[in-house]
Amino acid sequence: MPSATYLLEESYETLEAIETGDRHHLREELGDLLLQVAFHARIAEEDTADPWSVDDVAGDVVDKLVRRHPHVFGSEQADTAADVEASWHARKALEKGRGSAVDGVPMALPALSLAGTLMHRAASAGVHVEPGDDDGLGSRLMHLVAQAQADGLDAETELRAACRRYVARVRDSEG
């Protein structure tokens, strides 16, 4: 398997540990993610064209946190979590030269998460567009994601919880 596949798998295992509240499993999976960071950084160190290390990664994240949180590290004020998020996205857009609220959203996200992220970003930027443009399944799913957001829910999390309940019912019926 490609190394990116392992990284993605470990990320999902970490998500599962968080959602199930299994702190021992979470500790184990965070260790596996940390191993992935170290592994990919080690590969990067051997790149003769553009080498960098795990120390460079750590330094970059510290610099990013300082730049994007002037309410903590500078003199700006953010009164709410929404203010913090808006400031973060505005600074990130400037740094990356993004012109749209939806620029930079990875289209490889799981589809329900992708839909939720796109709609959240658009709404946060004051852009209100109907989630679906026809009566096809994709548009209906977009509307369901929008409804979940309006209800304060995350569609991806809700569907995973429903899948866990389904698995339990299947196991029960198998006797």
What residue spans do the PLM features occupy?
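Flexible "arm" and connector segments at domain edges
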Residues: 1-29, 35-175
